[in-house]
Amino acid sequence: MTLILGIDPGSRITGYGVVRDTGRGCVYVASGCIRTGTGSGELHERLQIVYRGVREVIKTYGPVTMGIEKVFMARNADSALKLGQARGAAIVAGAEEALEIAEYTATQVKQAVAGTGGANKEQVMMMVMHLLKLTQKPQIDASDALAIALCHAHTRSSLIPHGLGTARSRGGRLRL
C-alpha cells in the first residue's frame, strides 16, 4: 500500500490530496488547501508558505511519491511565471523529503480520472468523489489535487507491469 500526494500548485492557493493506493483502487486519506493569503504579500513570502505547507503535509502523512500538475501557458505570462515558481517550491519540498516526483498535464489528469481530456472541473470533481467514495464535495483546489494523486496512482500501476514502476530520472523526477 503506497501513500501518494497530489499537488495542485498555485501562488495564492495550493491544493493537496493524499490517497492510499491499495493495489485494487485508492482510498481517501486527506485533502485541503495551503492558503498564502489574499493580501499583497510579497511573492517570496507566499512561496515560502507553499514550501512549508507542502513539507508539513509530507511530514504529517508520510507519502512516498508525489504527482504535481505541469505549468500550462496562460494568457497572462506573469501568472504562468508565478504558477511555475509555486510548483518549484512544492517540488523542492518533495525532493527534500526524497519523494519520487512525477509531473502531469491537466489533460492527462482529466483523461485518467474522467475518461476524457476535455472534462470540466465539475466532471472531474464528481469522478473524484465517486472513485474515493466521498460524501461531501472537497474544495476545488483539493479536488484537483486528489485527481492528480489518482492520475499518479493509475499511471504508476500501469507502468509496473512493464518493469517501469521504479523508473527514475535525475533527481528522482519522472517525466511521463
Curated annotation (Swiss-Prot):
It comes from the Bacteria. One of its GO terms (biological process) is DNA repair. InterPro entries: RNaseH-like_sf, RNaseH_sf, X-over_junc_endoDNase_Mg_BS, X-over_junc_endoDNase_RuvC. Mg(2+) 2 binds at E69. One of its GO terms (cellular component) is Holliday junction resolvase complex. Transmembrane segments: none annotated. Its main location: cytoplasm. Its EC number is 3.1.21.10. Pfam families: RuvC (PF02075). This is Crossover junction endodeoxyribonuclease RuvC. It comes from Pseudomonas syringae pv. tomato (strain ATCC BAA-871 / DC3000). The lineage of its organism: Bacteria, Pseudomonadati, Pseudomonadota, Gammaproteobacteria, Pseudomonadales.
